[in-house]
Amino acid sequence: DPVTEEQPGRIMHELRRGPFSAAVLGGPVYYGAVDATPLFVMLLAEAWRWGADENIVRSLLPAADAALDWASRYGDRDDDGFIEYQRATDRGLVNQGWKDSFDGINFASGRIAEPPIALCEVQGYQYAALLARAELAEAFGQPATARRHRDRAAALRKRFLDAFWLPDKGWYALALDADKRPVDSLTSNLGHCLWTGIAADEHVAVIVERLSSEEMDSGFGLRTLATSMGAYNPMSYHNGSVWPHD
């Protein structure tokens, strides 16, 4: 459905209730999020680790497989191995990662990136989702499935490191834009690459140094965008504010 952006296997972005819910994004349910689907697979494995009921987890494995299938069939729009987003209509969200404000994805100069956009953290989520599904496969007696997903994760990580690392700056690009140009701003998204494990071991120390620098660390949290970037504004929604989940 192009209005709600629903696709097979895709996890919804939000559910709105109330008399005017359909007036916002075309309906009470909206699927325009590029990150919710791999995060669902990660969450299922995390629930299993914390002792979720075996039968419930087993019953959700087909949904996890459908989510991973969405990533390759619909999320990867141009077969380059990365998950990208671009809204299907002029009613949807322009940006569909967690920084979903219209100006949330921009270059170091402040220029706004044009979609389709492949976010660094979303590639990390997909990497972690593949490993999560491999872990579940091992737990439920599916060794061949586990090997397949681990191989896919390793291939994604290699592609990511080749395409996103900016050696002259010492951080990963925030994203790749419509022309596959690295969006070179220094942002908190970088930290998600550490969390998911997609970052290379040899990059970890310099990334930690960048994130703990004065331009990123406000003293009470990480800024969403470094003070040295062209679009920095401490009062903005995603271009300098501090979000607790970061």
Predicted regions and their residues:
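Aromatic- and histidine-enriched alpha-helix N-cap/loop-to-helix transition segments
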Residues: 31-42, 59-63, 117-128, 185-188, ...
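Short secondary-structure capping/junction motifs at helix and strand boundaries
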Residues: 48-62, 76-83
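Well-ordered alpha-helical scaffold segments within catalytic/enzyme domains
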Residues: 24-26, 39-56, 70, 122-143, ...
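C-terminal transactivation domains of fungal Zn(2)-Cys(6)
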Residues: 114-120, 124, 128-159, 170-171, ...
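Extended glycan-interaction surfaces of carbohydrate-active proteins
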Residues: 1-30, 77-118, 155-245
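Hydrophobic core segments within long, regular secondary-structure runs in both alpha-
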Residues: 1, 41, 45-48, 58-72, ...
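Single, functionally critical "micro-switch" positions that shape active/binding sites
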Residues: 34, 52, 169
